[in-house]
Amino acid sequence: HPDNVSPAIFGNLSASCTTDDNEAVTVTYNVDERFNFLALIPNFETSTEEARKVMPKEILLKDALYSLSRLGAVIKAFETYNLPLLKKVMGDKIHEPYRKEIIHEYDKVRNICQKIDSAAFFISGSGSTLMNIVSDEKNIEKIKTELAKLEYKWQPILLKVDTKGTLVID
């Protein structure tokens, strides 16, 4: 899948698709380096196969429009470090409502993050890792303390955006 490989190769945020001629096309968008991505990695896994099985065969047009209509604003928020905008427009009705059901403690983890510090919260790929964008690194310890009270072990890891991608060193 080009959408899995392109961020590692190009860095930043990328969007990939396959054309009608079966050509892979990738475009990249700059992401402001001030973003703090907090990966929340649990001590359990969900398989991509399992995550695909919970998806409905069809989605409502209003749900597709809800998610797709926000895309431009989400990209702009990432480019400009606009946390208030990101918080308003980050939302998904295509896969998250279904895939969250196979991620233990999803709602509890989301509630902890939203209570303490969350500009955006989403499932990373098909799961089971969750991603929380924090505005202040100082809040990571508070989140970590609350996560430790849950049944499953959640390891928070602070990540910064890779703006360069893969580098070839001679």
Report each predicted region and the residues it spans.
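Active-site rim beta-loop-alpha module in soluble metabolic enzymes
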Residues: 39-101
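Glycine-rich, charge-dense phosphate/pyrophosphate-binding loop(s)
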Residues: 78-170
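Alpha/beta catalytic cores of group-transfer enzymes, especially the acyltransferase/condensing modules
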Residues: 1-35, 121-123, 127, 131
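Short, solvent-exposed coil/turn elements at secondary-structure transition points
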Residues: 11, 43, 160-162
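Short gly/pro-enriched beta-turn/loop segments at secondary-structure junctions
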Residues: 9-11, 32-35, 66-72, 81, ...
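Short beta-strand-to-loop capping motifs
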Residues: 18, 42, 132-136
